[in-house]
Amino acid sequence: MAKITRALISVSDKTGILDFARELAGYGVEILSTGGTAKLLRDAGLAVKDVSDFTGFPEMLDGRVKTLHPKVHGGLLGMRSNPDHVATMKAHGIEPIDLVVVNLYPFEATVAKPECTLEDAIENIDIGGPTMLRSAAKNNADVTVLVDPADYRPVLDEMKASGGAVSRETNFCLAVKVYQHTAAYDGAISNWLGARTGEGIAAYPDTVTLQFRKAQEMRYGENPHQGAAFYVERQVKEASVATARQLQGKELSYNNIADTDAALECVKQFAEGPACVIVKHANPCGVAVGGTLLEAYDRAYATDPESAFGGIIAFNRELDADTARAICDRQFVEVIIAPAVSPEATEVVAAKKNVRLLECGTWPEKQQPRLDLKRVNGGILVQDTDLDLYAELKVVTKRQPTEQEMKDLLFAWRVAKFVKSNAIVYGKGNMTIGVGAGQMSRVNSARIAAIKAEHAGLEVKGAVMASDAFFPFRDGIDNAAAVGITAVIQPGGSMRDAEVIAAADEHGMAMVFTGMRHFRH
């Protein structure tokens, strides 16, 4: 590679740019610049040529046109090894530009502001910057292009080692980074503007351009032989595992993040009082609402103490010292997450240095719609997040549920949304007493829920049952009645609904149809 002799620098993020430009000047590199960047460099005592002087054409249209000129893009795109290109450049007085340092108008930071208007957003769509980046990246055989301040030092070190040049291998890697950056930038613009078409999140575009940034590299994925990283959605604001602040503990693993998400999203369903959700392998093994956070935890733990070992615990209220102490004294726990953590609770958990303690902030009662993605070989499935609870509540049996049964039914129904299908949840008094998850047969899930309750020493008699989908046969009802279930909530919609309802009537059970299924795979 030839020595770098001319650089064009125009940056919104000015991190490290002064030191970088000073070292370039030390190599005798001519510096071209625009606007605020030129002023910053010049005020620091560096020799700078304005791009308008380089092109012989002034900036115009309130700065919208600065670098969109053949002398700039000819200097970037001209191939130094192509005699025709070299002759054309010479004929038109186009001088080569060997290095481009550009980062873009802060579109995402602008639209993240609550007061941002459409006009504000439009004015922060960079045109000249991406154009220069793409031109330089296309001609990476001859041009070095930098979009990330983290790359300044490695490039300077390479120039020092080579007498002022940068290798083609480095240029190629930097060019790839540019196209990743401009794709993300355009995606952010597309997504923000697209949300204002009137169709919003319900619209499924021909091309999905959701943008995620890498937040964490992991030692391994779901299993030790799998690599993994955690990417977070750009501009996400709602309290979530992606936005949570880790107060202490080991680095979150792949499985920690997946399970913490399941626990937190489940506990968000309960606004009526202090609630606790304990999750193991993405399934709730204990859920309860109590008069205090400690009571909620005690009751959730009582559902399935065996499965709670090594679990993830989520709360919907500030974690207090008494609850933290009960957890640390009683069980091994991987992660605890809550909207807030009291200083006293933080001190208690600090005695268990490996416990990952997360603070996620509060969330609105009504969650915003968003998209769920599932990877399949060769594509992704995209759907609306399952935020609704039911379409209707219709009693279909002769017996009406009592007031307490209806409360228990709605509690169990909310839990069932977060249990892997086929899902059966037994509940009583605002706590789960048995959870049957992930079975291929619905009646087997019901049997497992009963076994779990018996194993935990909990009384099933007088409890209610929630099923995430309809009962295809009456056997699930017969099985539930045999262990003491008195009321059932399910979507309905089976060809044999009449047979299932008749079974409930035979057993004197109340049954409520919701008109809404909650499969979870």
UniProtKB/Swiss-Prot annotation:
Enzymatic reactions: (6R)-10-formyltetrahydrofolate + 5-amino-1-(5-phospho-beta-D-ribosyl)imidazole-4-carboxamide = 5-formamido-1-(5-phospho-D-ribosyl)imidazole-4-carboxamide + (6S)-5,6,7,8-tetrahydrofolate; IMP + H2O = 5-formamido-1-(5-phospho-D-ribosyl)imidazole-4-carboxamide
One Pfam family named in its UniProt record: MGS
InterPro entries: AICAR_Tfase_dup_dom_sf (IPR024051), Cytidine_deaminase-like (IPR016193), MGS-like_dom (IPR011607), MGS-like_dom_sf (IPR036914), PurH-like (IPR002695)
Pathways involved: Purine metabolism; IMP biosynthesis via de novo pathway; 5-formamido-1-(5-phospho-D-ribosyl)imidazole-4-carboxamide from 5-amino-1-(5-phospho-D-ribosyl)imidazole-4-carboxamide (10-formyl THF route): step 1/1; Purine metabolism; IMP biosynthesis via de novo pathway; IMP from 5-formamido-1-(5-phospho-D-ribosyl)imidazole-4-carboxamide: step 1/1
SUPFAM superfamilies membership: Cytidine deaminase-like (SSF53927), Methylglyoxal synthase-like (SSF52335)
Keyword Amino-acid biosynthesis: no
Domain spans labelled MGS-like: 1-147
Top-level division of the source organism's lineage: Bacteria
UniProt keyword annotations, A-Z: Hydrolase, Multifunctional enzyme, Purine biosynthesis, Transferase
Residue spans crossing the bilayer: none
GO BP, sorted A to Z: 'de novo' IMP biosynthetic process
Disulfide bonds: none
Gene Ontology cellular component annotations, sorted alphabetically: cytosol
GO MF term list: IMP cyclohydrolase activity; phosphoribosylaminoimidazolecarboxamide formyltransferase activity
Enzyme nomenclature, EC number: 2.1.2.3, 3.5.4.10
NCBIfam families given in the database record: PRK00881.1, purH
Family: Belongs to the PurH family.
UniProt comment concerning the protein's domains: The IMP cyclohydrolase activity resides in the N-terminal region.
Protein name, UniProt field: Bifunctional purine biosynthesis protein PurH
Organism expressing this protein natively: Geobacter sulfurreducens (strain ATCC 51573 / DSM 12127 / PCA)
